[in-house]
Amino acid sequence: MAKEKFERSKPHVNVGTIGHVDHGKTTLTAAITKVMAEKNGGMARKFDEIDSAPEEKARGITINTSHVEYESPNRHYAHVDCPGHADYVKNMITGAAQMDGAILVCSAADGPMPQTREHILLSRQVGVPKIVVFLNKCDMVDDEELLELVEMEVRELLDQYEFPGDDTPVIMGSALRAIEGDEAYVEKIVELVQAMDDYIPAPERDTEKPFILPIEDVFSISGRGTVVTGRIERGVVNIGDEVEVVGIRPTQKTTVTGVEMFRKLLDRGEAGDNVGILVRGLKRDDVERGQVLCKPGSIKPHTKFEAEVYVLSKEEGGRHTPFFKGYRPQFYFRTTDITGAVELPEGVEMVMPGDNVKMTITLINPIAMDEGLRFAIREGGRTVGAGVVAKIIE
């Protein structure tokens, strides 16, 4: 008898607030929790509770993030808000808080500012699928034309980074007035959440994606063959499935002849399971840690890609000195380190600890990768940076 499946009545969607400092991200977060709690049940969270974000560690990097939850009529939202700009950069690059969509907060009184642009760019680089816009502090702008101008600027900025500016929902409101209970502005929060329900797609569940298992270990079991072990990253695998071994060496095909978990035999394994998979016709030496087992054709090995990278500061245990072009650290993908060479963008001579930078990386061996894959940069086993694959080149 299978375990009872955990039933969620509403789909679960992860979102976050992004935008320039002091444009009202945290106030909006507080306003949404208050209005949704009144309409749909749940807990209202005050500005101060959200603002004093606890420290978390993601891949050895310290990030301050606040997590709140609320219900819309159709969905359950988990929402992240960060106090400082650096926290956003780290959060998005490490994927510590996965975002199915983002709420871009822009003050109508100030219009788009440098971090507005940077957060849109980061969203593009790390693969945030959709953005909805909340023009905040509209109560401070009397001029209708000025509001339209700011809206136009934001839409153009979205277009620049390949988000559909014209189709993006833009809600005009005031988070503070909504918290104070001003009905007209409370209505704008309801409108915003409705726009999120309609415009941000519900994420595909991990079990519905193509199967992939990063290989951690390989054993040979006499009389039975070769077993690879690891945790299934996504998808489902059944006995009899054809799979490929991808990365480091030329791709090989094989068939799954057994799946076991805690020494019990199963018919199938799914995302999140730690399993041993028996593969037909492969010797122990044909497979190694760092490769992946996957659905045939679903993922290809690559060596050259563009990445968005955050370099740890000295305080975070990173490098004490900058690095220059020709830097050759190890790149840790899933279960293994691969050496690679770094090319910096034109006009960038060096990268300081604490910076974030776009770079092109060429690995000495191919690794199974998709855009959006996260990695760590290491020197002799010590993490000195975190990155995400933004664009595959070859």
UniProtKB/Swiss-Prot annotation:
Region (G5): 174-176
Binding positions for GTP per the UniProt entry: 19-26, 81-85, 136-139
Pfam families, sorted: GTP_EFTU, GTP_EFTU_D2, GTP_EFTU_D3
Cellular compartments per GO CC: cytosol
Region ranges (G3): 81-84
Region (G1): 19-26
Residue ranges of domain tr-type G in the record: 10-204
Region (G4): 136-139
Cellular localisation: Cytoplasm
Principal EC category: hydrolase
Chief localisation class: cytoplasm
Molecular function per GO: GTP binding; GTPase activity; guanosine tetraphosphate binding; translation elongation factor activity
Protein name: Elongation factor Tu
Lineage start: Bacteria, Pseudomonadati, Pseudomonadota, Gammaproteobacteria, Thiotrichales
Gene for this chain: tuf
